[in-house]
Amino acid sequence: MSIILQILVVALIVYSFVLIVAVPITLSTASGWSKSKSSIVTASIGWVGMVLLTGVLNSFVS
């Protein structure tokens, strides 16, 4: 179970870095928010889900 948590934490870190780079680039385009609103919201919801899943799994490991 510990290895699964470690893999999930690494995936969360990588996903966070991708969002840190991708969201500002997407929003800086001419039609940024209106064109990419659903993608940004979906990616953000996925990130929140990963954070919650990591927290739940951490409660079982610790």
From Swiss-Prot:
<feature type="transmembrane region" description="Helical">
    <location>
        <begin position="41"/>
        <end position="61"/>
    </location>
</feature>
<keyword id="KW-0934">Plastid</keyword>
<comment type="similarity">
    <text>Belongs to the PsbZ family.</text>
</comment>
<keyword id="KW-0604">Photosystem II</keyword>
<dbReference type="InterPro" id="IPR002644">
    <property type="entry name" value="PSII_PsbZ"/>
</dbReference>
<keyword id="KW-0812">Transmembrane</keyword>
<comment type="subunit">
    <text>PSII is composed of 1 copy each of membrane proteins PsbA, PsbB, PsbC, PsbD, PsbE, PsbF, PsbH, PsbI, PsbJ, PsbK, PsbL, PsbM, PsbT, PsbX, PsbY, PsbZ, Psb30/Ycf12, at least 3 peripheral proteins of the oxygen-evolving complex and a large number of cofactors. It forms dimeric complexes.</text>
</comment>
<dbReference type="GO" id="GO:0042549">
    <property type="term" value="P:photosystem II stabilization"/>
</dbReference>
<dbReference type="Pfam" id="PF01737">
    <property type="entry name" value="Ycf9"/>
</dbReference>
<dbReference type="GO" id="GO:0015979">
    <property type="term" value="P:photosynthesis"/>
</dbReference>
<keyword id="KW-1133">Transmembrane helix</keyword>
<keyword id="KW-0674">Reaction center</keyword>
<protein>
    <recommendedName>
        <fullName>Photosystem II reaction center protein Z</fullName>
    </recommendedName>
</protein>
<keyword id="KW-0793">Thylakoid</keyword>
<keyword id="KW-0150">Chloroplast</keyword>
<dbReference type="InterPro" id="IPR036512">
    <property type="entry name" value="PSII_PsbZ_sf"/>
</dbReference>
<keyword id="KW-0472">Membrane</keyword>
<dbReference type="GO" id="GO:0009535">
    <property type="term" value="C:chloroplast thylakoid membrane"/>
</dbReference>
<comment type="function">
    <text>May control the interaction of photosystem II (PSII) cores with the light-harvesting antenna, regulates electron flow through the 2 photosystem reaction centers. PSII is a light-driven water plastoquinone oxidoreductase, using light energy to abstract electrons from H(2)O, generating a proton gradient subsequently used for ATP formation.</text>
</comment>
<keyword id="KW-0602">Photosynthesis</keyword>
<dbReference type="GO" id="GO:0009539">
    <property type="term" value="C:photosystem II reaction center"/>
</dbReference>
<feature type="transmembrane region" description="Helical">
    <location>
        <begin position="8"/>
        <end position="28"/>
    </location>
</feature>
